[in-house]
């Protein structure tokens, strides 16, 4: 059952209408909440309420190649980071955009659709470094496989599922791009691999995409759309959740306050309230409900329920977008209408988000047993340079520096996989209507920018390759504004360029970190909020640290495992 309608924000907890009583209330229908709603409602005697702030996806969101256009729409919360000191300097007010999904499917309806699990070491560290039993790679692999329906070939069936709801596929890459970059990376000791979600992640490969036919796969299309007829699954759209109802004496969560159609409602939970509002909003909601750093809540006159480091330890991948390869080949020179026609025929460039072609996960030691330091994303550019600037929110004064020839250029984005820097999510005020303050604190640790620079150096070392010359290709000489005081192409010049043209990837993790100690963590290994009863968090905010890649696949796994943890607790496993 789906309850639609639109809300107008009005906040009051004193006069709320009764919305009903449910066994489980799930806040947020994104990568975590969508999976949970499906799996928990498999138990017919459980009555599940899924509260979503946005509405249903439309046909526009099905096209991965148009994903960036959703960032400034009602399908996103419209967030920016706070002004950064060491990154985002070419963005308006030094504030990178930080889109977070809003609507059924959450971020899975607006992201680039890339499917990356990470390196086995990532999950083994969850156990060995962060003290979370049950989350090693071998223990979570069955949950990656459970949701997956892998269609691409070749693949190793030991590592892949073939009957799950989430379809993973590859689309044909542009031959010239593959033929150029495969041998170029091979010269640097980086081999082509068929499947980075298989035995080895490190190498250069085609991207695996959340793609079914030519349409995006989201938690809406995979886990919700075909299950709305379940009488025990209640999906309510356009709800603005303002607070979790908590019995302060017993520290028990028993319901949720929210606004719908300008009316204040209260829904009661008999078993659990599960917060799956996303990497940013879950931390915001916990703090508004009195769970968070004692001093911060006191400063905002929010009554303290539980002192926990909510909002601390925020991490995000940061990427450098300033490297462009120019070739003498024409890739795509069509109008948008012509590209949409190609899309209908299952052809590029709109088949993938950001027109991604190839990916390389690389560690500098070339050791497959060690997780990568860097991700290289190789893409053809969007249909026009102005759209490139639009995607990243680049300040007008920097537009000319990124001078893209959209028909013949190749973008190479460099992601820092494992930053040492830690940021925070804090509240601007005690009002749910105020956007949270998101500070990823990029490059606060010098080691981060040094590692990213090493990633740049590796690509620069390709510039004299005969392979490039054979394609009439070269790395574009970008004139980075405000870096003229440094010797061109010197290390300091590149460090300056990185600070100006490094951007958010919107992979918000760890603000409600999972771990064994409530002094440094918010939830335990069973995703229960410390010191609280009947309250869990299941989304990217509980990941102990960033994984080696994008975060949708790990959150799907997390929610699959969380569903079994919950079923086991109530003997319904």
Which residues does each PLM region occupy?
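N-terminal redox-cofactor-binding region of secreted/periplasmic oxidoreductases
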Residues: 1-573
